[in-house]
C-alpha cells in the first residue's frame, strides 16, 4: 500500500520501485508507482474535499497542523533514521531536518497572519477589508536532498490557507514521503485534503498536466522547473511557485581569520555532501599571498573530510550522495573541468566503488573559457582568483542563476556595495551561504526561481487576496457627483 488517496492506503498500479540505502545498498522500501488514472483520482479526491476544508475556521486547520507538529516531536528519532538511511546523510544532520520541520509549524502560523489573514480599515461610511482565499487544489513536488523539510515548507502553509493537496515525493525518497504522510493521517486530516502519489518523471508529468489543478509548488532542479514552466505556459489562472537551484558564489576578500574563513567555506560548499541548492559552487579568492595561504589551508582541511555511513560513530561531517549515479556525475563534471584546462587542487575520490561516498573536490578555473554555468549537485568547488572587488562582483554575477551569494570581509562598505549590485535572493556577510533565516523569504531570481520565494513568504503563494468595501446599510451620499440629479419632480 504505497499511495494515500481520499484517506485510504492503496496499491499503486504503475511500475515497481525499490529504494536502497545509497551507501550499503540495503533495501529500504518497495512498492508500486501510481498510474495516470490514480493521479487523476487523487486530484478528484482533493477537489471534492476542498470546499469543506476551505470553510473550516482557521483555528480548526491550525489545530490539525499543530497535532502534526506534536507527532513529529514524538517520532523525531524514527523519522530521523528514515531520512538518514534513505538519503545517506549522517544521523546528526537528519535530526536537524526534523527539527526544522517542527519549527516550520509555528513560523507558518505567524506568517499566515502577518502576510495574509484578514485586515480591516475603518472608513467614514463603512470599512475596507482585506481577506485571503485559498487557490484550491495544488500539487506539491518534493526534492530528495531534504525530503521532509522542503516539501513541509509548501504543505504546511498551503493547508493552513485552506488548500487541498496532491504530494509527489522525489522518486529517490519514497520512504520519507510515506512516513511523513502517515503522521499527517494520525494528525486527523479529513479524507482527500492531502493525497500521496509515488512515481518518477512520468507521474510528475501526469500530475502537472491535470486540467483540474489550480497550481503547483515545486522544489528541485532548474531543468525540471523550466519544463514545468513551459508545461503551464498559457495558464495564468494557475499559481506556479518554482524553487530551483544555484551556481552560487562565495567571495573571500579578507581571510585574516584564516581558520574561520576556511570553516565558513566548508559549511558553504560541502555540508550535505554539497547537495543544498544554496551551496557555494564558485569560490572567488582575492589574488595575493593571503589568498594563496587561504587556499592551501582550505585544501588541507577539506582533504581530511571523510564521508561516512549515516550511523557511524563518531559521526562524519558528510555522508553519501543520494545515489552512486549522483557521485559519478560529480566525478564526470570534475574531469570535464580538468579537460577544459582547470588545475585540480584537491581531487574528489570515490571511497568505495558502487557506493555514493565521495570526498570533496576543489579545482581552480581562473582564465579557463567555456566553463558550464550549471549546478553540479555535489561536493565540487570551483575556484577563480580576482584582482579587485569590482571584478569579484562581476564574476559573482556571471551566471544565469541567482539564489545565494556571500562575502567574507571586515569592510562594511564592501558588503553594502554587494547588496546593491549582487543578483541573488540571499546575500550573506561573514555567514555561510547555506544559512538562511526562517523569518525571511527563501528564494532567488533568474534560473533559481520565478519570484515566488518560500519560507516566510510561502503564505503569499498559498492564497490570493480579496479586497472588499463594506457597509451594513445602503445610503444615498450627502454629496452627489456632478451631473446627477435626484430631486423629486412634481407630477403634472
Swiss-Prot record:
InterPro entries the UniProt entry points to: Ald_DH/histidinol_DH (IPR016161), Ald_DH_C (IPR016163), Ald_DH_CS_CYS (IPR016160), Ald_DH_CS_GLU (IPR029510), Ald_DH_N (IPR016162), Aldehyde_DH_dom (IPR015590), SuccinylGlu_semiald_DH_AstD (IPR017649)
GO annotation terms (biological process): arginine catabolic process to glutamate; arginine catabolic process to succinate
Enzyme class label: oxidoreductase
UniProt keyword annotation of Oxidoreductase present: yes
Entry superkingdom: Bacteria
Pathway: Amino-acid degradation; L-arginine degradation via AST pathway; L-glutamate and succinate from L-arginine: step 4/5
Keywords associated with the record: Arginine metabolism, NAD, Oxidoreductase
CDD domains for the chain: ALDH_SGSD_AstD
Documented EC number(s): 1.2.1.71
Chain positions recorded as NAD(+) binding sites: 220-225
Active site as annotated: 243, 277
Keyword NAD in record: yes
Catalytic activity entry: N-succinyl-L-glutamate 5-semialdehyde + NAD(+) + H2O = N-succinyl-L-glutamate + NADH + 2 H(+)
GO molecular function annotation: succinylglutamate-semialdehyde dehydrogenase activity
NCBIfam families reported in the protein's UniProt record: arg_catab_astD (TIGR03240), PRK09457.1 (NF006992)
Family, as annotated: Belongs to the aldehyde dehydrogenase family. AstD subfamily.
Protein role: Catalyzes the NAD-dependent reduction of succinylglutamate semialdehyde into succinylglutamate.
Name of this protein: N-succinylglutamate 5-semialdehyde dehydrogenase
Lineage of the organism: Bacteria, Pseudomonadati, Pseudomonadota, Gammaproteobacteria, Enterobacterales
Gene giving rise to this polypeptide: astD
